[in-house]
Curated annotation (Swiss-Prot):
Belongs to the CC2D1 family. Keywords: Coiled coil. It comes from the Eukaryota. This is Coiled-coil and C2 domain-containing protein 1B. Residues 82-154, 218-249, 441-463, 478-502 are annotated as: Disordered. The gene is cc2d1b. PANTHER family: COILED-COIL AND C2 DOMAIN-CONTAINING PROTEIN 1-LIKE, COILED-COIL AND C2 DOMAIN-CONTAINING PROTEIN 1B. It comes from Xenopus laevis (African clawed frog). Residues 685-820 form the C2 domain. One of its GO terms (molecular function) is DNA-binding transcription repressor activity, RNA polymerase II-specific. CDD domains: C2_Freud-1 (cd08690). Residues 142-154 have a biased composition (Polar residues). Residues 229-241 have a biased composition (Low complexity).
């Protein structure tokens, strides 16, 4: 069709068909089974000759059919079975199969039923066997191997016609064994079974193709095992691995002679072979005892190896090493037992489970948990010293472990903090051992630990409820009665675990509460002075301790009002303050601007009035009301100034104003008590107090600037308009963020006056750190334009003047109050405009001011 001539192909040389096919890669079988099994040794294979004849076209010469192979002797079959059970890759390098624990456990499943029958028969039947003298020389594992070989021989007798069925059953057997071995984490056994499974699959494929499969090459059946390690097996000796030496009588040899010989091992001389029956029986019993001991040792060694493997898989390397060391000791004992030396099993280690329980119990005994504190622990000084050292040691270890955990998690700050606390505990332990006095109150207690011996009263601070109950007891004893003996109350020891007063309360319970509350504040100051803290650290410690006590008192008041949620909230804040106190003690200062502010006082509902407007009343009731209002006003000022200095981080001024606020509150309580009793008002007077305050407009944010147009003064009127007919309004323009996009607005129109009162506020958006804003503040300002409002379409709005305000003072002040001149072009008009500009705080520094105020003080006027 394409121009080719149909010609006769060149004839191929005769007899070259098979060679050409092989050159082209045809009829070449690279199957893995042939590579693994090899070519059969029989050169006269009829199937191969028939196939060759079909390929070459030559008639096959008929040859006499070879005779079948003679069956192999039992000794060779037994040897082949043992070779099949051996790992061909050399992974399990065991020279002696009799000591392989894994193979013993595997064979144990195969011959389990026979062993049960043997255990039910008395041991004397074994002695009556004609081969008793031979079995005496073998151990029980050898008998198990022989019985398994017998079963394997039985399984090897496969009918000729059921080869495919046998291979399929054998493959199913191996697959089940592989799955069970993988579930039991026996990787070596699983790999060995997988190699046998590959061989079986190759044989099955060869059998399906019609090729001959040699029965002797079929891998023997294996024990499927069990999918999980059961607590007890059919072999009774496994029970002995879970018992002590006293349970060794439960070994399968249950005869009295075996027990006697186990307790008293026979002398090696008595094991000499003799011809009389008594000597044979004695040697047999001794051999059985050795077999039992060896079985127990092998099983116990296997248990420890399995326990080491499980510990390694769970990541407990130390426990795995310990179990492996114990299992190696069993090898030494087994060698001694095989050499004929007597072995005492009384010191044999217990099972891994019992060993773990014993180790745990020994740890509990070595490190007992501290007993709960008792009421008379301070009286037993001899026992308290030891328990105190133990408690300190436990807490030091706890902080060391916490530091290690923090390091491992990457939290270096927390790790350093825990290390400092651990060092503090270490110094305390050294001082305690040296007999020096130590202050246990400054040691932080780790969470979950009981209080140190001798410090039981701090247990009440462990939880919110206990702290509130203790504080409530203090409050109840303070308000029961008015008449009291003050000296008797002062005689109470301050270090009582539960400071309850059995005497009547003072006349002024508020003062006693305050004194009770201020006592713990002085203790940390004393400790700080003993440890020579720097002045800044000591100042912050006093401030934080005082703030903590205030929150605890607020929690007490909330508890008395049955407001448990508020009380718990205050106690949580007190605990966070304790963390800050520990941080300051460790040498790191805190930012007091982030310290929680003073707790809100719900009893401070009042209306602030100016005391200049109050006239001195004649009635005592009016005097009480006036004093209460003034004290509330002073208290509010102190709290406001304290918050301002807290934001600045000034500890000294913050503490000063907080103390002044406490004095005002105490005076209010005195007035309330006196008024309730119907007494005359206590003496009082006014003093001029100089206060250093910081001006902060807290209602503004850092991105806001407030512009207030207050009023206009004598604004000029346009021509033709009388001053009283001026309808003026003010426009302003603030050139930020840019001159092209300024912020601008205007006021309302105030009609018929040239001195309008506007009092209008405008919030402007700013960015304090922006260079453009700073340039506007320094060089420009805010421009104002005053307009006269026109009427309808007759007149338009007419400008009557302009003014501007410089803002450079905002760098050092938070408020500018200016009365600026109104100009008509460059000509002054005589009118003025009052303007206020406010920031939250100055751009640079703080707006500190010194003011003098009249301060109400309760008491007589001091004499000069």
């Amino acid at each position: 069709m394409l121009g080719r001539k149909l010609g006769k192909k060149t004839a191929q040389a005769k007899g070259r068909g098979a060679a050409a096919a092989k050159e082209l890669g045809l009829f070449v079988d690279f199957s893995p089974e042939d590579m693994m099994l090899g070519i059969p040794d029989d050169p006269d294979d009829g199937d191969l000759e028939a196939e060759l004849a079909a390929l070459t076209g030559v008639k096959a010469v008929s040859k006499p059919k070879p005779k079948g192979k003679a069956p192999l002797p039992m000794e060779e079959i037994e040897k082949m079975a043992q070779d099949c059970m051996t790992d061909m890759t050399g992974e399990d390098d065991d020279d002696d199969l009799e000591e392989d624990e894994e193979l013993l456990a595997e064979l144990q499943d195969v011959v389990g039923e026979e062993e049960e029958v043997e255990q039910s028969q008395p041991s004397d039947t074994e002695e009556s066997e004609p081969s008793a003298s031979e079995t005496q020389e073998h151990t029980e594992p050898e008998q198990q191997v022989n019985s398994s070989v017998a079963e394997i021989q039985h399984n090897l007798q496969v009918p000729a016609g059921g080869m495919l069925q046998v291979l399929e059953e054998r493959i199913g057997n191996y697959k089940e064994a592989i799955s069970n071995a993988k579930l039991s984490n026996e990787s070596a056994k699983a790999r060995r079974y997988e190699r046998g499974l590959k061989t079986l699959e190759s044989m099955l494929s060869a059998a399906r193709q019609g090729r001959t499969v040699i029965e002797a090459d079929i891998p023997p059946p294996v024990a499927c095992g069990k999918p999980a390690v059961s607590p007890t097996t059919d072999v009774p000796t496994t029970d002995t691995s879970k018992q002590g030496l006293g349970d060794l009588n439960d070994v399968p040899m249950e005869t009295t002679e075996a027990v006697t010989n186990l307790e008293k091992p026979e002398d090696p001389v008595s094991k000499a072979t003799t011809n009389d029956g008594g000597a044979v029986e004695k040697t047999h019993v001794a051999s059985e005892n050795d077999t039992d001991s060896k079985t127990v040792l092998l099983l116990r060694q296997r248990d420890y190896k399995l326990a080491a493997l499980k510990a390694k898989q769970t990541g407990d390397i130390e426990k795995a090493k310990e179990y492996m060391k114990i299992s190696k000791k069993f090898s030494v004992v087994l060698e001694a037992l095989e050499s004929g030396q007597p072995v005492d099993l009384s010191n044999m280690p217990a099972a891994p489970e019992d060993h773990e329980a014993m180790v745990t119990e020994s740890k509990i005994i070595a490190h007992p948990t501290p007993a709960p504190p008792v009421s008379n622990i301070l009286n037993t000084q001899g026992s308290s010293v030891g328990s105190l050292l133990q408690a300190l040691q436990q807490r030091m270890e706890k902080y060391k472990s916490a530091a290690q955990q923090a390091k491992s998690s990457g939290d270096d700050r927390k790790a350093r903090m825990h290390e400092r606390i651990a060092k503090q505990y270490q110094d305390t332990i050294r001082a305690q051992k040296a007999g020096r006095q130590v202050n246990l109150a400054e040691l932080p207690v780790p969470p979950g630990f009981p209080p140190l011996p001798g410090m039981e009263q701090t247990e009440e601070e462990g939880s919110v409820e206990k702290a509130l109950e203790a504080a409530q007891k203090l409050a109840k004893t303070a308000g029961e009665d008015v008449d009291d003996d003050e000296d008797e109350c002062q005689a109470k020891p301050p270090g009582h675990p539960k400071p309850t007063q059995l005497v009547k309360p003072l006349v002024m319970p508020a003062i006693s509460d305050n004194e009770e509350r201020l006592l713990p504040i002085k203790a940390p100051v004393k400790v700080a002075s003993e440890e020579t803290f720097p002045p800044a650290v000591q100042e912050q410690l006093e401030f934080l301790e005082h703030r903590k006590k205030q929150y605890r008192k607020a929690a007490l008041q909330a508890k008395q009002k049955n407001d448990l949620e508020q009380a718990k909230q205050h106690m949580r804040v007190a605990h966070t303050l304790q963390v800050s106190i520990d941080q300051v003690k460790s040498g790191k200062l805190v930012d007091i601007s982030k310290v929680p502010s003073l707790p809100d006082d719900e009893e401070s509902d009042f209306v602030v009035v100016e005391h200049e407007d109050i006239k001195s009343p004649q009635n005592s009731e009016d005097v009480y009301n006036m004093l209460m209002k003034l004290l509330h006003e002073q208290h509010e000022k102190c709290i406001r100034y304290s918050k301002q200095f807290t934001q600045m981080g000034n500890v000294a001024e913050t503490t000063r104003f907080e103390n002044m606020a406490e004095d005002c509150k105490k005076n209010c309580e005195i007035l309330q008590l006196s008024q309730a009793q119907g007494l005359d008002p206590p003496p009082y007077h006014f003093e001029d107090k100089t206060l250093k305050i910081v001006r902060v407009f807290s209602e503004l944010s850092s991105t806001e600037m407030l512009l207030i147009i207050v009023r206009g003064i004598n604004l000029p009127a346009p021509s033709g308009v009388a001053p009283n007919d001026l309808d003026a309004y003010v426009k302003f323009e603030f050139p930020y963020p840019s001159s092209e996009q300024p912020q601008k607005n205007k006021t309302l129109v105030i009609k018929n006056t040239n001195s309008p009162e506007y009092e209008q506020s405008f919030k402007l958006n700013i960015n304090r750190n922006h260079r453009g804003f700073k340039r506007v503040i320094q060089t420009k300002g805010i421009k104002f334009e005053i307009f006269h409002k026109g009427f309808f379409l007759v007149r338009s709005d007419k400008q009557v003047g302009s003014a501007s305000v410089k803002l450079d003072k905002l760098e050092t002040q938070c408020e500018i109050r200016e009365i600026v001149e109104v100009f008509d072009g460059r000509k002054p008009t005589g009118g003025k405009l009052e303007i206020k500009v406010r920031l939250r705080d100055p751009l640079n520094g703080q707006d500190l001011q010194v003011v003098t105020e009249k301060w109400l003080v309760m008491g007589h006027v001091p004499r000069k």
